[in-house]
Amino acid sequence: MNIVNVGKAYGSLTVIHGVSVEIPDGEFVVLVGPSGCGKSTLLRMVAGLEPISFGDIEIDGKVVNNLPPKDRDIAMVFQSYALYPHKTVADNMGFALKMRGERKADIDARVRKAAEILDLVPYLSRYPRQLSGGQRQRVAMGRAIVRDPKVFLFDEPLSNLDAKLRVQMRAEIKELQRRLATTMIYVTHDQVEAMTMADRIVVLRDGRVEQIGSPLTLYDKPANTFVAGFIGSPSMNLVKGHIRSGAAPFFETDEGIRLPLSGAPAASDGKPVYYGIRPEHFLLGGDVRADLTIVESTGSETQVFARLGQQKIIGVFRDRVEAASSQPFAMTPNTAMVHLFDAQSGLRLD
């Protein structure tokens, strides 16, 4: 399917600004961004629940802008399970097929097949009140699966689940997509969900596309400071300062603190830039001294919160770190992993 220069305006206020995404058959695409970025609005336009102001939605090579949702051959799973409390799991899953006038034998067969995929066979005769949150969400997915759509749409389906169940359901949805080999578009504000589930991620901000790419592309080569700060947990450190050229170029903060570079930077002497380094790309020791504020250990790793002058930084280390707060702490960036961004535009400097 294709999203071609799609926009949404409410009067003079444009909230989606010409978004274009080409999605090959069978791809798992995640729309991610902060609250209010337009990801759910875009999904609703794909579903036909929200009119398009301009642009085209193409499914299976056909423009579907004016088709009602029921004729687009899509199935949607919402944050709310929206199950009928007085119907069994089997009846909930097969309800849309019943409304379409499908034969009972066909409905039963498709419900059974979906239930086998989702491990719901033992629960087919139960009612929603007798199920856990994860089981209810699987019923909602089963209701979509039985329709055998060309495209699945997920609108923050895991938001109502606790942390442990979210991890489990992430894996189940990804496995479901692999088994069905059907195109899926998934909306979330959680970048961890995006990183762990997507074939490709579309990062949105204020109704505009900031970057499209595989999870590792976005992580390793963010296009700008927004993507750099949004993708990754903890997020990338962005330290403001200037490039200092010469025989051995380096980065210098406004307070005169120097950070190393590898080779000649793609920026002229004195150019204001952001020096980007992910927390796990600091090395213990070296010549850089930060002022330690907090040390947090999870057992498997240690997070070090510190300051370079007035700018906050975070380092993540596999080693156990024993250090006292308010003391100088040696942590040096791995220069091979440094990113530079233009301080004015925020764009990546290669």
Predicted feature residues:
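Conserved ABC transporter NBD signature motif
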Residues: 54-63
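ABC ATPase nucleotide-binding domain
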Residues: 2, 22, 58, 330-332
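Helix-to-loop junction immediately C-terminal to a conserved catalytic motif
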Residues: 47
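Non-catalytic connector elements of ABC transporters
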Residues: 234-238, 246-350
